[in-house]
Each structure stands twice: as structure tokens, then as C-alpha cells.
Amino acid sequence: MLDSKDSQIAQQLKSRLSQITQIEQLVIFGSRARGNADRESDMDVFIEVPTLTPHLRRSISEIAWEIGLENDLLIFTLVATPGDIRNGLLGANPILRAIEKEGVAI
């Protein structure tokens, strides 16, 4: 479960990203989603977008970095398209299982 500050940061990230692309899903996972994060924990974010170019991937990383810097937080982004997931490009990645099991959709 996200605390209110994490929820606010996630909403801010989604809002900023929505200005540059359509967001199919934005899911927080990892220690912040489980509720056992400490001051040093990063925020793990899965972002699903319709299409992904190198430019868009870079822009998403830059926005996450800016918001993280404003909030003294490292934001790790995992960005994929529906095709990446459907075609198994992410494979049997344990991160996908964690996202499904503990993820908090924003």
C-alpha cells in the first residue's frame, strides 16, 4: 500500500507523462507498493505505453529523474508496450510477476 507522499509522486509522474504520451498502465511495485520501504528505497514504476521509441524512452527517464530529484527519490522505470508483453519480449521476468502480485495501479 502506498503512503500519501508516494501516491502523490506517482500521480505527478503519471500526469507529466500523460502530457507526452498515452499511458496504458502505470503501476508502482517493489518495497513502496508493499509498504516496507525505508528512506533509501527507490520507487519502482512499470509504465505501459502504446508505442515506444528511443526518444520517448529517454523522455520518460528524464521526467522520472526530474520528479525524483524534486522529491529526493530515485525513480526506476520499466517501460513496455502491450506487444512487448504479449510477445513475451520481457520473457518470464520475475519483475513481471512482482508487478502482477504486489503492484498498485495509479
Labelled PLM ranges:
Residues 1-24, 33-35, 39, 49-106:
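Catalytic core of pol beta-like nucleotidyltransferases
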Residues 29-31:
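Glycine-rich beta-strand-to-loop/alpha-helix junction loops that act as flexible
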Residues 43-47:
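Short beta-strand->loop micro-motif that forms the acidic, two-metal-ion catalytic signature
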